[in-house]
Amino acid sequence: MRLSVIILAIFMISLFIMAAFLFFKRRRLDGSYHLPSLAKPTYRKLTQDDYGVISDYLSYFGTSKFSAGYSLQNFPEIPTKGEVVTTLRNIVNRFAGSSEGINHWRYYIDAVEIHIPPLLVPYLQQENVLDVVCTPSIPIVIGVNGHFLKDEKSHFSALSLKQLSEPILSNGTSTIQKNEGDAAHLLHIRQETNEEYRLHHSSGFWNGSLICLGLILWLTALMMPQVFLPWIMAAGGTFLVLGLFLIYRPIIKSRKQEVHCFKGRLKRWGLFGNFDHGQVKNISLGGIDLVYPPHWEPYIQNDIDKVTYLEMYPNHHVIKQGPYLSLHDEEKNYPYKRYIKNIIFVVCSLFIIGMLYLYQPLSLSMKLTFSWIKESEPHLVTNFTELETAKLHVGDIIQAKGVGMCYMPPNLSSKNNKTIFAPFDCSGIYWNNSNPMPMPESSTIEKAAALLYLVEEQLHPVSNNRVNPSLGQAITKSGMNLLDNFDGIILKTQDLCPRENECIRLKMALVNLSNVNDWPSLVQRAESGKLTGTNVLLRAVSAEALEKLVDTTTSSFIYREIDKAAILLNSPPPGGVLLISDERKQLVDYASNTNSVFEPTPLEQWRELQRLSDILLHTPFNTGGVITGMVIDANGTLQIFLHSMPDSMTLLYYIGNTLLLFFAIGFLILNLFFIIRRRRQNNQRMHKISQYYEHCFYRPPQ
């Protein structure tokens, strides 16, 4: 639950960060924020005075006689109040155009067209400090090198058509870029086609990212509690639909650039213009320096010094020249296959497969899903031989009822390579027809228990009738302990440890409490009755040390016997069937001894083992579930792993995991195929385009 909440929180934060990034990026791209500047631009709010001047200028221009002769296709509109004024530093480029017989200038900062009022044009220089305001159409300049439009408001009425179409630069040092020389006639302006747009924009990164985000949200929903499932699934579906919509119906109309269509004479200028015909960067049209695609270089010279039809972007990048050279036709006939989104899909598929593998066992999800698809009836079994003879398969459902023994195969500890025994782990049921195993018995443990009881009785007496009451009270007040059956302790120690090398520390301690020099002599005196009635006084510290020594000595014997019983119980007879819960759930309900809140002593562990063995070595059971695995071990025992039947919601999670896994695998293979195929097509694309142009320009006359 905690992991699920953490994953959900991470995704929510990621979505918030992505949304904020897109929002601020869009703001940066809106209006004048995207205008390039040679120095760091500054920003301020549009004042009321500036807003009024812009409104007066645009209103006067739109209602005056200029609108009849001047193209208003890219004329600015009234900006919104509170718009930002950007102060930047850059070079202004201009070229001439004609519309309905009227010449006019169009101004650009790099590839961005701007509107400069004619009254501010005389103040332009080689590098200019401009105050630019964004409008719904194109930006308008309200200040040039310290001269502002509001200072020229009184001259609005003096504007003439000649000033508008051919502004005079009164400043002799003004050096804006302009297209002089052979005339270039602007025929019309159009929007770029979808094919031209795809060449430099349609990478599919955002579309693929939205689809991957939807799939990852679906993966997250399968790891979340039920309460979050519908909401996260709905969010993931929304991103998927949006991504698919953008792939098949991209919203590109508002993002298309303008294409300027010219007719004019191409010239080769510059340092290499007279002798180096391999240069494609020194060709111009009416003073406009042109930028060509590199693979057009062998074919451009056919149109030099000829009147040619040409289409280009505002940044002077040519996209069509003459009857043959055309990026539109190239993309239409030999499309460039982009595979960025396919790479994103591959990474997303690998991530989903990895998360499914780490978070939920994939084999279990698939087995339970196949079991649900088969919709088989449970196999009712009352005898283990039916399981041995039946043709069972993974995914089948069984219901077993009978009498067996709680048993789980022992695990192997990597630390000490010793079998770890958990008494009667009822997550496994051993089922056969052999006689039930006997309850564990041990005479050694009974002897150890007798010694423990005797020492406990003397060091912590409840009532002692063998000692004078007044003497007992005096001993207690003095902080001493009385051993009034010292010979009994000696005899029971000898009975537990008959060998000379056993219980050496305990034997030495008892010898030190007597007047005898060695253990055999002490035992002989106790057996002869010479120590009968002998009382031994011990200080509290000595009594505590003796008690701990007896506990330690007897514990080693008890644990040894428990290990022997574990080996016996871990060695059931061969054959039969072992039903195991792969969820480690208890298949039999039984009452465990939970009276003590402390760790049980070795003797208590032995008593609990005896109590449970009497119950669970031969216990009735009724269990069932979906078979998730079957194996026959070295003893010939058929081990069947069962998973309890999930409820409808859990089954839905398992089915969702399986379907998402198969989808991710198929998605991975499909996109790997697309990546390889598209790379091969792109490698052959330029060769096919070159063959096409060779055929167009150099085909033999018919």
Curated annotation (Swiss-Prot):
Membrane topology value: Multi-pass membrane protein
Coiled-coil boundaries: none
Transmembrane segments: 4-24, 204-224, 227-247, 343-363, 656-676
InterPro entries reported for this sequence: IgaA
UniProt keyword annotations, A-Z: Cell inner membrane, Cell membrane, Membrane, Transmembrane, Transmembrane helix
Main location: membrane
Record-given protein name: Flagellar operon control protein UmoB
Subcellular compartments: Cell inner membrane
GO cellular component: plasma membrane
Source species taxonomy: Bacteria, Pseudomonadati, Pseudomonadota, Gammaproteobacteria, Enterobacterales
Domain of life: Bacteria
Assigned protein family: Belongs to the IgaA family.
Biological role stated in the UniProt entry: Up-regulator of flagellar flhDC master operon.
